[in-house]
């Protein structure tokens, strides 16, 4: 009986929350061909080393309550970068704001950790040289799905 109870306790605690792992590459050597055939140099976040960064960057998806771990590698051309989790309620050490959290130097990597607090749509972006980096493409979407499985994040509005 004790074994069955322990087994059920472990299963129930494992079902409640899960972990989302994300791998992002920060790059400044991307290219984007526009409608008239011109090629633009773009910055951005890529899902792997073999692709140019898409604009916007890769989607980060998690469920409310999940532990999210972002492994961010900076392979840019001598630039520092961060990942600011815009609108998410995360601790200061993982917020990606220069001089308040940490920068990821060229050819280095850093881990960002947070528990997905509230369902909704959010944005991540580099917070070093914010204007230039955002205009060049260093941003991407975040979707935190409601823990109850519904398709809405609030009622009555």
Where are these regions (language model features)?
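Sec-dependent N-terminal signal peptides
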Residues: 3-13
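N-terminal, post-signal-peptide metal-ligating segments of extracellular/periplasmic oxidoreductases
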Residues: 17-93, 99-103, 108-109, 144, ...
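Thiolate-centered catalytic microenvironments shared by cysteine-dependent enzyme domains
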Residues: 127
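Short, solvent-exposed loop/turn segments at the edges of extracellular beta-sandwich modules
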Residues: 130-132
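Extracytoplasmic/periplasmic copper-protein system
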Residues: 135-157
């Amino acid at each position: 009986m004790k074994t069955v109870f322990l087994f059920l306790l472990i299963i129930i605690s494992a079902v409640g929350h899960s972990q989302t792992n994300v791998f992002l590459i920060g790059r400044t050597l991307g290219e984007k061909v526009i409608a008239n055939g011109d090629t633009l140099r773009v910055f951005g976040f890529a899902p792997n080393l073999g692709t140019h960064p898409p604009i916007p960057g890769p989607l980060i998806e998690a469920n409310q309550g999940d532990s999210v771990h972002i492994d961010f590698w900076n392979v840019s051309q001598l630039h520092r970068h961060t990942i600011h989790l815009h609108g998410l309620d995360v601790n200061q050490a993982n917020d990606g704001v220069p001089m308040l959290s940490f920068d990821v130097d060229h050819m280095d990597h850093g881990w960002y950790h947070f528990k997905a607090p509230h369902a909704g749509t959010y944005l991540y972006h580099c917070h070093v040289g914010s204007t230039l980096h955002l205009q060049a493409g260093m941003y991407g979407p975040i979707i935190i799905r409601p823990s109850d499985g519904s398709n809405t994040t609030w009622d009555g509005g």
